[in-house]
Swiss-Prot record:
HAMAP family, per database record: TatA_E (MF_00236)
Gene that this polypeptide is encoded by: tatA
Family to which the UniProt record says this protein belongs: Belongs to the TatA/E family.
Protein name: Sec-independent protein translocase protein TatA
Binding partners and assembly: The Tat system comprises two distinct complexes: a TatABC complex, containing multiple copies of TatA, TatB and TatC subunits, and a separate TatA complex, containing only TatA subunits. Substrates initially bind to the TatABC complex, which probably triggers association of the separate TatA complex to form the active translocon.
Function: Part of the twin-arginine translocation (Tat) system that transports large folded proteins containing a characteristic twin-arginine motif in their signal peptide across membranes. TatA could form the protein-conducting channel of the Tat system.
Length: 103
């Protein structure tokens, strides 16, 4: 009496369920339960694969760390080029002037 789920109690419960629902309905319910278990296992497997794919993608993102290069606007670059060009032009004039003085 201490154990509620003894084998004899389970058999009696199964017989009552069989009588109430009928043989066809019980087999249909068991089929539905089996389909549910299969669908659950399939979804768990797909979820595991998605998790593995995400982990692989995160590994790739760590290895391909691309940093953007800083660039200056064109107006700043052109101004810098003009300064360089004008200073070399001035240096050229100065060297020509020195040569002429030396003569």
């Amino acid at each position: 009496m201490g154990n509620i789920f003894s084998p004899t109690h389970l058999i009696v419960i199964l017989l009552i369920v069989l009588v109430l629902f009928g043989r066809g309905k019980v087999s249909e319910l068991m089929g539905d339960v089996a389909k549910g278990i299969k669908a659950f296992k399939k979804n768990m497997k797909e979820e595991g694969e998605l998790l593995e794919d995400k982990l692989e993608m995160s590994d790739y993102s760590k290895t391909t760390d691309v940093r953007p290069q800083q660039s200056q606007p064109l107006s700043v670059k052109r101004a810098a080029e003009r300064r360089k060009g004008s200073s070399s032009f001035k240096e050229g004039k100065a060297s020509v002037a020195k040569k002429q003085r030396g003569k």
